[in-house]
């Protein structure tokens, strides 16, 4: 290159491949309050040092690529690169490490969960130098979280809208999830709401199929809501699933729900996508609709302990993208969920400030500042005998959702709903009187059966039903 055409970028440039750790492993780095921090569970390929593996994660999820490029000289790499600043071995696991990476805030578009995930997990998980990679947790700084609207309304506003306080809310997923006509579906909703539930729900894959088009379902469910409200004097709702094949169609369904005057709609946020979810959440805030979120597809991403992304990360992302409810497992039901881990991400959904607590899987202190909280929904294989444990585990700010545990009642849907409501009221009263739900739960339910034949019948049907399998995802030994 002649002196006339030589540029600053070309001075000192040396083509070739160099170790990631020379640039991206910086154990001396002190994290900034504005950094997004990530904790990755890294399993390197044999022969790859943990420092190189951690640095590769930092590089490939920020500014790096596989070879040196001359355009590095056109920017400030130190300002924009991700940094692997700490590595610790995972106790009890061979060749597995927790690698901590700090990302400068300027790497991310404001108010975009889509962009955040595209950067942090979009490409690096296919990297050949790693046998497996899992994103365990993220620290979202207030500087970034304040660029998001968050939940459309939040816990307190929802309680005020419903005029319901001092207890968990009760819900039911209509079963069978597929195959009912719209009129029969609406009838099931009415019976459950009349029997004592606060909400009924579309299942995640109820969209607009040949046997039940969405508009018909919305109309019959709205009729069920208004009829049940008139009879009970309580505000009722049904999660009308607005998830659709396009964002435009999704919004059309949400607009129709608002025109019907119903209080809440629903979205499958992982299959529907974060861009669609954020748009729907903004519409819901502007138009007074609550937003229920289903996490369909989450276990594809989060169930394996050594690869993927933990649900606590998906939960934080949902709080940022927007939702008033989100499914969070049950601990005691048919779906995966270890108690301490579940309580960790439940706090991350509901609370304003959550301290680091590795015993519950929380890797970073998280400050949400003024962002509203999300109500966790316990759903999946639960019935009246689980009510004391659910009330004790999840507390008042939760939705306890019994699908088969309502519709499977031998006397029908309304008695099934009544059984659940009586069981809940008995547990809340016992707790308020100072009784130990964990120790005395069965006695509390049995005593309530004396005053409720519906509850007694439910207890008899499900007395031997248990789901006793060890969870796959457990807390690391610290």
UniProtKB/Swiss-Prot annotation:
Removed propeptide positions: 1-2
Query: Where is this protein found?
Result: Plastid, Chloroplast
**PTMs?**
The disulfide bond which can form in the large chain dimeric partners within the hexadecamer appears to be associated with oxidative stress and protein turnover.
As stated in the Swiss-Prot or TrEMBL entry, residues carrying the post-translational modification N-acetylproline are 3
Positions bearing N6-carboxylysine = 201
Name the positions where Mg(2+) binds. Answer: 201, 203-204
Q: Which reaction does it catalyse?
A: 2 (2R)-3-phosphoglycerate + 2 H(+) = D-ribulose 1,5-bisphosphate + CO2 + H2O; D-ribulose 1,5-bisphosphate + O2 = 2-phosphoglycolate + (2R)-3-phosphoglycerate + 2 H(+)
Q: How is the cofactor bound?
A: Binds 1 Mg(2+) ion per subunit.
Which residues are involved in binding substrate? Answer: 123, 173, 177, 295, 327, 379
Recorded GO terms, molecular function?
magnesium ion binding; monooxygenase activity; ribulose-bisphosphate carboxylase activity
Q: Which domain of life is it from?
A: Eukaryota
Site feature location: Transition state stabilizer: 334
Spell out the note in the miscellaneous section. The basic functional RuBisCO is composed of a large chain homodimer in a 'head-to-tail' conformation. In form I RuBisCO this homodimer is arranged in a barrel-like tetramer with the small subunits forming a tetrameric 'cap' on each end of the 'barrel'.
Report the family membership. Answer: Belongs to the RuBisCO large chain family. Type I subfamily.
What is the protein name given in its UniProt record?
Answer: Ribulose bisphosphate carboxylase large chain
Name the species this protein comes from.
Answer: Neurachne tenuifolia
UniProt gene name:
rbcL
